[in-house]
Amino acid sequence: MCIRDRCGSISLIVAYRNPDSEVIGFEKNKIHHQVAILNHKENNLENLKFKIQDNCIFDPHYENYFDLILSNPPFYFANKVIQSKDPSINTSKYISESDLKKWLNNIILYLKTDGTAFIINRYENTDFMLDMFKNFNLEVTTTPLLSFKDSKPKNVLLKITKSNYFIEKTLNAIIIHDDLSNYSKDIENWFK
């Protein structure tokens, strides 16, 4: 399952690489949903479907449903930055703190007991997300993402599994680009 804004590209990759799986992409933004549907038709993947779904509204049909969840919640808190006047951009980049809590809570509820969720977000939101996750029996592994070696983390990757109690782990940072702006060995290995 791909719960995110602009769900099409990641859902396509997961469906292509896992042809025997069922892949569902949730998308709230109607324009992004239409683009995802066009890409789906173009690539003719039978194991993929998209659903218009606000990720902040719980759908009981999907409780304990997914083995794998990939999610990219909006990165910016709506009340802390200047927002775009384009409504398509607003739904994909900005979120309230209360809606982000709902989004993350739904990920936990949708995840099977032995499932895994991966969430990417801004590094500066890490403490906010961890504080929310501490209310659940989860193992949360945090991996800072650096654009280049020796740069400050811009984003973070959270790996979430259900547990008997809350466990927090931190892994070494993943460096995205090498000195020539190519993908680093970290990224090449991670995508394998």
Predicted features by range, described:
Residues 7-20:
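Conserved SAM-binding loop of SAM-dependent methyltransferases across substrates and taxa
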Residues 73-102:
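Mobile active-site "lid"/loop adjacent to the S-adenosyl-L-methionine
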Residues 58-69, 77:
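A short acidic, Gly/Pro-enriched loop at the edge of an enzyme's catalytic core
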Residues 1-5:
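Conserved small/polar residues in nucleotide/adenosyl-binding loops
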Residues 36-37:
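Conserved SAM-binding loop
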Residues 152-192:
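SAM/dcSAM-binding transferase cores
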Residues 96-153, 157-158:
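Conserved Class I SAM-dependent methyltransferase catalytic core
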